[in-house]
């Protein structure tokens, strides 16, 4: 445990918040894309589909690198049990709160919008369970994965810490080229695991909890660990915060490959396995692109940025049902996809900010949506 706090990483705080808020245009553009979703516009937009695909191809990979970075930073600051408790509470409590308050009403709304209420009694017990797993976890899946990664990383982080204490500090002798090869092989390994499961027991890939707990965790654990390693080795972090033309070009080529796979791939063939390899390496390269841009443009303290950093999780949690409501009841009345997209951003962001301000004034809701216990008056006085 370290009593010396690490310097504030303003650009990482900002990037994490903007990646979270990017979920709003991502889901609104999904309404107007060629991808089949809960709600879709009458005519899809090719440029909103392209925009949606671009966000989807890298956003969460970069997010989990930042999560791993901050998780290990806090691991060094707190005793093990307290670290695990704090980390799990910060993500677990908002997730458990959002299920009855957000995703359950969202599920009921979709049952009526898609006229599936009459079919519900005819479903088997497993079909009901699996439907609820997909619909109630919904956009909260990354919080569940963070709880799992926090628990799994106890042993890994402990090993990292012991190595730091017993070994002499030395640079992380690994180039971006070598990292790219490692992540390519990790993508191949993930693809092989998925293909084996597809051959042996394909039905399990449609199981919601298996997808969230096993498949998503397996895919994102390398990025989470990479974030921790970036904290341990400043020279590794410097590789990500220094612009790399190779990473930028590589990410562009990978995105083109991603689009071609989406266009010509088949789910019954190798489409998903190919996508996992592409998004694994593209995610790594986009860490460099996003970190270097963020380090140059966002590495400063600002009251406005701090506001959105603090608000980003709440806004992300509430934006999904608001987006679906907009798509179901307002989108059909707007003929222009561009105007509909812009109206959706204003509608969702505006209501989300109002709800955020309301919840700040209700201590119970503030705790439930942040996982942070209220600060005692004595503590405030001591700090101030």
Curated annotation (Swiss-Prot):
Pfam family, one: Acyl_transf_3
Domain of life per record: Bacteria
GO molecular function list: acyltransferase activity, transferring groups other than amino-acyl groups; transferase activity, transferring one-carbon groups
GO biological process annotation, one example: glucan biosynthetic process
Its EC number(s): 2.1.-.-
UniProt GO cellular component terms: plasma membrane
Protein localization: Cell membrane
Lipid bilayer topology: Multi-pass membrane protein
InterPro entries: Acyl_transf_3_dom, Glucan_succinyl_AcylTrfase, Glucans_biosynth_C
Keywords per UniProt: Acyltransferase, Cell membrane, Membrane, Transferase, Transmembrane, Transmembrane helix
Pathway this chain belongs to: Glycan metabolism; osmoregulated periplasmic glucan (OPG) biosynthesis
Residues annotated as transmembrane: 17-37, 54-74, 91-111, 140-160, 173-193, 212-232, 240-260, 274-294, 311-331, 338-358
Cited function: Necessary for the succinyl substitution of periplasmic glucans. Could catalyze the transfer of succinyl residues from the cytoplasmic side of the membrane to the nascent glucan backbones on the periplasmic side of the membrane.
Family of this protein: Belongs to the acyltransferase 3 family. OpgC subfamily.
PANTHER family: BLR4337 PROTEIN, GLUCANS BIOSYNTHESIS PROTEIN C
NCBIfam families reported in the protein's UniProt record: PRK03854.1
Protein name: Glucans biosynthesis protein C
Organism: Salmonella paratyphi B (strain ATCC BAA-1250 / SPB7)
Lineage: Bacteria, Pseudomonadati, Pseudomonadota, Gammaproteobacteria, Enterobacterales
């Amino acid at each position: 445990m370290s009593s010396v706090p690490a310097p504030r990483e303003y650009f990482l705080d900002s990037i994490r918040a903007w990646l979270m808020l990017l979920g709003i245009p991502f889901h609104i553009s999904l309404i107007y894309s060629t991808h089949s979703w809960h709600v879709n516009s009458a005519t899809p937009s090719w440029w909103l589909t392209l925009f949606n695909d671009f966000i989807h191809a890298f956003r969460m990979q970069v997010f989990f690198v930042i999560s791993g970075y901050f998780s290990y930073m806090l691991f060094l600051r707190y005793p093990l049990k307290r670290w695990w408790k704090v980390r799990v509470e910060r993500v677990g409590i908002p997730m458990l709160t959002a299920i009855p308050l957000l995703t359950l009403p969202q599920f009921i709304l979709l049952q009526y919008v898609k006229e599936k209420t009459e079919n519900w009694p005819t479903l088997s017990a497993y079909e009901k369970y699996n439907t609820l797993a997909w619909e109630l976890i919904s956009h909260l899946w990354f919080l569940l994965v963070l709880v799992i990664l926090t628990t799994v990383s106890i042993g890994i982080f402990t090993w990292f810490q012991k190595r730091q204490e017993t070994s002499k500090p030395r640079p992380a002798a690994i180039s971006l080229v070598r990292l790219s090869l490692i992540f390519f092989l990790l993508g191949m390994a993930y693809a092989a695991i998925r293909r084996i499961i597809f051959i042996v027991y394909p039905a399990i890939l449609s199981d919601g909890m298996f997808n969230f707990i096993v498949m998503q965790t397996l895919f994102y654990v390398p990025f989470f660990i990479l974030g921790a390693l970036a904290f341990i080795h400043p020279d590794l972090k410097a590789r990500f915060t220094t612009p790399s033309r190779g990473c930028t070009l590589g990410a562009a080529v990978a995105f083109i490959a991603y689009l071609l796979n989406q266009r010509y791939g088949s789910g019954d063939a190798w489409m998903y396995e190919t996508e996992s390899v592409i998004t694994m390496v593209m995610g790594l390269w986009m860490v460099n692109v996003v970190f270097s841009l963020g380090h140059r443009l966002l590495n400063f303290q600002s009251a406005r940025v701090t506001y959105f950093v603090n608000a980003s999780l709440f806004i992300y949690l509430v934006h999904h049902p608001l987006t679906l409501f907009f798509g179901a009841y307002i989108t059909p009345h707007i003929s222009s996809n561009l105007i509909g997209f812009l109206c959706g951003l204003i509608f969702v962001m505006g209501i989300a900010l109002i709800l955020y301000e309301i919840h700040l004034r209700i201590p119970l809701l503030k705790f439930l949506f942040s996982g942070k216990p209220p600060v005692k008056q004595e503590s405030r006085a001591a700090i101030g």
